Swiss-Prot record:
Glycosylation site list: N317, N580
Organism annotation: Pyricularia grisea (Crabgrass-specific blast fungus)
Descriptive protein name: MFS-type efflux transporter pyiT
Matching PANTHER family: MAJOR FACILITATOR SUPERFAMILY, MAJOR FACILITATOR SUPERFAMILY (MFS) PROFILE DOMAIN-CONTAINING PROTEIN
Protein keywords: Cell membrane, Glycoprotein, Membrane, Transmembrane, Transmembrane helix, Transport
């Protein structure tokens, strides 16, 4: 591993993979790029099962929201009902893992990439779907809140693997240039699942039973398992016996990363809400979290870490490093908007929660469609850098336009602004992973995908925590303008976020109500202003990327799906399976161009 860290280049040039090289034309593509192989039944059955599993995973993240009150009453959950939501995302996103008493396992999101290299994709994917299905069954049959929480934890563990492995398998099956359009389809269904979840949950609770919020996954997940078993055949497991493989897992790195993220999020979540930011617990948590991240990076790059779960070589290439940062910022901004637009609708426009969901539909629909369009555009052009430039530029402008929102903004203006921001956020969603892998060798696909999924997950949570902290801090600064003591007590120290409903605001006299709305308007304005900075940093980060040409050929020596094209890999005796093998080939690889990773001078 030490050789790998030292041997792989630290420049902006991608590291080509080993294989027979097709003639390269003057545009950087191979002469055979124009001919695309047709995809047969094996591929489409596999892809359909991946789409369905990703959709179900996203659906379960939101479907419970409208069913929670009914579930809480049925199981007499009282205040514990919140864990039904939190426990799902804890195991999935590795944030509060260190605080979750019911979990003793290590962090799962990044480690799935390492497990995929050691044991292969096929059985790991089937196992993740089975775990998700078992968790759904436990939740549906729950007779106590503790049983329900345990089932949600199991669901979350399965969902963590599904989200990462779906993307990784597509990387195995498709050349770089074709990945964008298929990622676009996947993300469109993921967004669709997140959007329709609350509506479906309400219908199932009203018409059938809250238990079918969970039972509905079982038949569809069963179909996915059958399809994956018969049609997904990828042989890329590592060598060695079970004990040897277990020894290669980066347990300490995973633990250190989870603890660091959890410590930072504790400070962001409870700072200025439960405790003031000057409180020792908040300061210590934030400092320990930041130091933990630094320690994690040093450990991953050190000789003590033989098999890093997040090797620093992923970030030594300027294109992959820039795309990773852009991934984090794009996800952060998307949830920044997704969570605070509804708050604006209810606290300032004074609409109901149901009406707020309807008003958010333009954002959700355009977000899904633009994700699909962005992936297709990447496949069409064979490049990604200019797409990222345009997207983040529009994202920065879009966040700026949100600062004009107030109580008198018309619905037409709101819809237009939503669509602008959604278009900007959605277009790069399906091609950021492609940009990362265009600059890295295929041997790093699993680890690069695991890191991509982790940064996206962290961006999801920070995209809520950071603007919430900004909002609460600004609201408390403006709160002295409010003279009503009842309103002050309800709104201070984080209460403003919880009380952002039309019912609460309308419960006060008109003069007090006007002041409350004004404070909400100015607090949200600060949220959008800081959001401009994050989007702007994303635009600047794109300058790190090189304008790489995406190839249309895929080496398939490890893939048994018959309709996947056989190209340069047919003449390759063996492909390096470990980073060390890749490093040993580095002097040769630097002199060659891969069929799907061509270098270009920008």
């Amino acid at each position: 591993m030490e050789k790998a860290k030292d041997s792989l280049p630290t420049t902006g040039d991608p590291v080509p993979s080993q294989g027979t090289i097709n003639p390269v034309d003057e545009t950087g593509g191979s002469a055979s790029d124009e001919k695309k192989a047709k995809k047969g039944c094996d591929f489409w059955f596999t892809f359909s099962s991946l789409v369905l599993t990703a959709f179900l995973s996203a659906l379960e993240g939101s479907v419970v929201s409208t069913a929670l009150p009914t579930i809480a009453r049925a199981l007499e959950a009282s205040e514990n009902y919140v864990w039904v939501v939190n426990v799902y995302y804890l195991s999935k996103y590795e944030t509060w893992l260190t605080y979750l008493l019911r979990f003793s396992s290590a962090a799962f999101q990044p480690i799935y990439g390492q497990l995929a290299d050691l044991w292969g994709r096929r059985w790991l994917t089937i196992g993740a779907v089975v775990i998700f299905t078992v968790g759904s069954g436990i939740c549906g049959g729950a007779t106590s809140i503790d049983m329900l929480i345990g089932g949600r934890a199991i669901q979350g563990l399965g969902s963590a693997g599904i989200n990462m492995l779906v993307e990784l398998i597509l990387c195995d099956l498709l050349p770089l240039r074709e990945r964008g359009q298929f990622f676009g389809i996947i993300f469109m269904f993921v967004i669709l699942g997140s959007v329709i979840g609350p509506f479906l949950g309400g219908i199932l609770v009203d018409r059938v039973s809250w238990r079918w919020v969970f039972y509905i996954n079982i038949p569809f997940s069963g179909v996915c398992v059958v399809l994956l078993f018969f049609f997904l055949h990828i042989k890329n497991a590592g060598t060695g016996n079970f004990i040897d493989k277990v020894k290669r897992i980066d347990f300490f790195g995973n633990f250190l990363l989870a603890a660091s993220v959890g410590s930072c999020l504790f400070a962001l979540t409870y700072g200025d809400t439960r405790y003031p930011f000057s409180d020792t617990r908040i300061i210590v948590s934030l400092v320990l979290g930041l130091l933990g991240h630094v320690a994690f990076m040093f450990f991953e790059a050190s000789p003590w870490c033989k098999e890093p779960v997040m090797p620093m070589v992923l970030f030594k290439n300027r294109t992959s490093a820039g795309a990773y940062i852009a991934t984090f910022l794009q996800t952060l901004v998307s949830f920044w908007v997704l969570y605070f637009l509804p708050l604006y609708f209810q606290s300032t426009q004074l609409v109901s929660a149901t009406r707020s969901g309807v008003m958010l539909l333009p954002f959700s629909v355009v977000y899904a469609l633009s994700s699909l369009a962005g992936g297709a555009l990447t496949t069409k052009l064979g490049r990604f850098r200019n797409i990222h430039f345009a997207s983040f530029a529009l994202m920065t402008i879009g966040m700026g336009t949100l600062t004009i929102l107030n109580r008198s903004t018309s619905l037409a203006v709101i819809v237009v602004l939503e669509m602008i921001v959604a278009l900007a956020i959605g277009v790069p969603t399906a091609n950021l992973l492609t940009a990362i892998q265009a600059a890295l060798p295929d041997e790093l696909n699993a680890l690069s995908t695991g890191t991509f999924a982790f940064l996206r997950s962290v961006g999801t949570i920070w995209g809520v925590s950071i603007p919430a902290a900004i909002f609460n801090n600004r609201f408390d600064q403006l709160l002295p303008e409010l003279s009503d003591p009842t309103a002050v007590r309800a709104l201070q120290r984080g209460g403003a976020y919880q009380q952002a409903t039309s019912e609460f605001v309308d419960s006060f006299p008109s003069d007090v109500r006007d002041v409350i709305i004004s404070i909400y308007e100015r607090s949200l304005e600060r949220v959008w202003q800081i959001g401009i900075v994050f989007a702007g940093v994303g635009f600047l980060v794109i300058f790190l990327e090189r304008d790489l040409k995406l190839g249309t050929q895929k080496k398939t020596e490890d893939i048994e799906i018959n309709d996947i094209p056989q190209t340069a890999a047919d003449n390759s005796a063996s492909r390096p399976n470990t980073i060390n093998d890749t490093a040993s080939q580095a002097p040769i690889l630097k002199q060659r161009r891969s069929t799907n990773q061509e270098r270009e001078t920008v």
